[in-house]
Amino acid sequence: MEPRNFDTLRDHLTKDFIWPSVYMFKFIAPADNRIFALLHDLFPHQAEFTNRHSAGGKYVSITVKEMMLSAEEVIDRYEKASAIEGVIVL
């Protein structure tokens, strides 16, 4: 899998957010407990998870809210999540 370029997101986060800030991460993944567990392990237990299954039940959208200290922390989390096979970062 080719590494995703997060430069545009980095610019947006640097210009439009005041850090620290609560950031809302969004992902889409197959409805697979293993993938969800891997994604869940990237975040501390204080992070707030919301899941919504697709109509057919094959996929789940995952929203995570967490207090982040910097744009670089957000980018780092997205890079780690994008390395999980099947996870789409939004």
Task: Label each residue range with its predicted role.
Residues M1-S61, M67-L90:
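Long, contiguous binding/interaction regions
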